Amino acid sequence: MEKQTLLVTGGAGYIGSHTVVELLAAGHDVVILDDFSNSSPQVVDRIAEIAGRRPALVEGDSGNRDTLRRLLAQYPVDATIHFAGFKAVGESVAKPLAYYGNNVSGTVVLLECLEEAGARRLVFSSSATVYGDPASVPIREDFPTGPTNPYGRTKWHIEHMLNDLAVASPQWSIGILRYFNPVGAHASGRIGENPRGIPNNLMPFVTQVAVGKRPKLSVFGGDYPTHDGTGVRDYIHVVDLALGHLAALEKVVAGKGAWTVNLGTGKGYSVLDFVKAFEKASGKPIPYQIVDRRPGDVAQCYADPSLAAEMLGWRAQRDLQQMCADSWNWQQKNPDGY
């Protein structure tokens, strides 16, 4: 693939920052658009430090028409990777309008501006939450969708919108990536997951328990129909996920139309499997307590990743032990985040 100028919305976020590092390493020019509502400006310095060159940065909201028009007039964007969005399941249940407004309405504005600028190549961050509670696992892309919470429904609406757009306007080329559960951190320990306040995701919560920031891990639900009663998920290393975006970008640049693939490892681990792996990686005990299930959570969710291998030539390489080791390295080097 020739060198591209890439707009990365939410490029200072957890998955976005790791992807920007890989895009820069592959020789592309990157423009990050981020309002830092859930990330830190320091991330951009860390990205530059790892990659040896700096992405351009526009501070602003990816759903703001004026910001987007200015950016697209200034930079010759070849393709866009759209990460920006609110992403906490529990918060989406409490604040559905904020989620529909930011995620769905914001994406409509982004697409209108890209259409206007003739920048009709897009890779979209979707989520395995669109599958809801699957009838069986592993989950294939042709399984029925039925998200069980507003966050998942925002992703589901955007997927439909992108498919409708590709039908109406055949010059669009769109890759939809359904992520499973990203964990881990860059091997340098310079960028990683840095949640504000109480973490919603398992890994940062576990790392905070390991360093004594939190007394114990709350495990939501011990009565699921799984091998140990705790929820089973497909954890994928964030660097593998970032490389999946590079593979998706190649396909988007080369083709037309819309397509959807899962990005997961194909292996399901329970919360307690995860805790054991982290204890091994860190040498620290992780005290935990089983509490009530969380609304909107499903029993088990892991990918059939074969379509991504076939279509994109991409496979996850890093195992759970590596994910835990890299997260522990990040936590030790950055006890207070950025």
Model-derived regions, located:
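N-terminal Rossmann-like NAD(P)+-binding domain of SDR-like oxidoreductases, especially those catalyzing
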Residues: 1-185
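A generic fold-level signal
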Residues: 1, 94, 102, 169-171, ...
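Pocket-edge positions in alpha/beta enzyme catalytic cores
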Residues: 60, 72, 99, 194-198, ...
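Short, contiguous strand/loop micro-motifs
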Residues: 5-7, 97-98, 134, 149, ...
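Catalytic core of nucleotidyl cyclases, primarily class III adenylyl/guanylyl cyclases
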Residues: 188-190
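Short, basic/glycine-rich phosphate-binding loops at helix/coil junctions
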Residues: 184-186, 223-224
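Short-chain dehydrogenase/reductase
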Residues: 100, 148-156, 192-200, 204, ...
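C-terminal substrate-binding subdomain of Rossmann-fold SDR/epimerase-dehydratase oxidoreductases
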Residues: 203-338
